[in-house]
């Protein structure tokens, strides 16, 4: 069981506010094209991130095979802390990849401590 960080309650509250806003957009328009993305500094299994990506939304990074499902390496541990959550209208036909060009490199050789996440979303 991973340790519970002191910031967890704040992250969960923030995720709940964002989730409520995204749900309100879907209530107004069931075909709304909603994207919530970024360096959330939290894992896919954390309560806040899991809530953001719960149905009907989808965390596209979870489509990747587990060995490729990371965007950051800290003290030798590969971690997924960057996320792309989309509404059903965007999930259909979406493509996602993480380009592992930074996280596996030494500090001197990389341009960032995170790998870039590439997402292709369907046109209307």
Q: How should these model regions be labeled?
A:
Residues 1-10:
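Active-site His/acidic residue clusters
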